[in-house]
């Protein structure tokens, strides 16, 4: 059985979030939380919140044992981009793309043996 949590339209660039999400894929939940707490990136607290939500979903909805949970899937997709303009010299303007992310984490119980 798998439990899933998704954070949609989070204001962090997907490229930056993927750096952090790659660190926790395949790890046990307790180890993943420890890694996120000690990773000095802006995406770390956001991903930790999604991971805790996935664990809570597993415990509440599917009666899974929290100590046996493993991060089976963790990925970041691109969300909608907010387009902004930065004024430049000579009356020109440059485009600024404020990128957003959809963060998905799936946890499941580790098989015995």
UniProtKB/Swiss-Prot annotation:
GO terms for molecular function: rRNA binding; structural constituent of ribosome. It comes from the Bacteria. GO terms for cellular component: cytosolic large ribosomal subunit. Keywords: Ribonucleoprotein, Ribosomal protein, RNA-binding, rRNA-binding. It holds the Pfam family Ribosomal_L22. PROSITE patterns: RIBOSOMAL_L22 (PS00464). One of its GO terms (biological process) is translation. Transmembrane segments: none annotated. This protein binds specifically to 23S rRNA; its binding is stimulated by other ribosomal proteins, e.g. L4, L17, and L20. It is important during the early stages of 50S assembly. It makes multiple contacts with different domains of the 23S rRNA in the assembled 50S subunit and ribosome. The globular domain of the protein is located near the polypeptide exit tunnel on the outside of the subunit, while an extended beta-hairpin is found that lines the wall of the exit tunnel in the center of the 70S ribosome. NCBIfam families: rplV_bact. Belongs to the universal ribosomal protein uL22 family. Part of the 50S ribosomal subunit. This is Large ribosomal subunit protein uL22. It comes from Anoxybacillus flavithermus (strain DSM 21510 / WK1). The lineage of its organism: Bacteria, Bacillati, Bacillota, Bacilli, Bacillales.
């Amino acid at each position: 059985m798998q439990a899933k949590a998704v954070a949609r339209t989070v204001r962090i660039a997907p490229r930056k979030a993927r750096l952090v999400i790659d660190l926790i894929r395949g790890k046990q939940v307790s180890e993943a939380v420890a890694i996120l707490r000690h990773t000095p990136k802006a995406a770390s607290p956001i991903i930790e919140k999604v991971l805790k939500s996935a664990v809570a979903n597993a415990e509440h909805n599917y009666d899974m044992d929290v100590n046996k949970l493993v991060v089976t899937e963790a990925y970041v997709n691109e969300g909608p981009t907010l387009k902004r303009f930065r004024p430049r010299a000579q009356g020109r303007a440059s485009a600024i793309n404020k990128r957003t992310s959809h963060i998905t984490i799936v946890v499941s119980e580790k098989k015995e043996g």
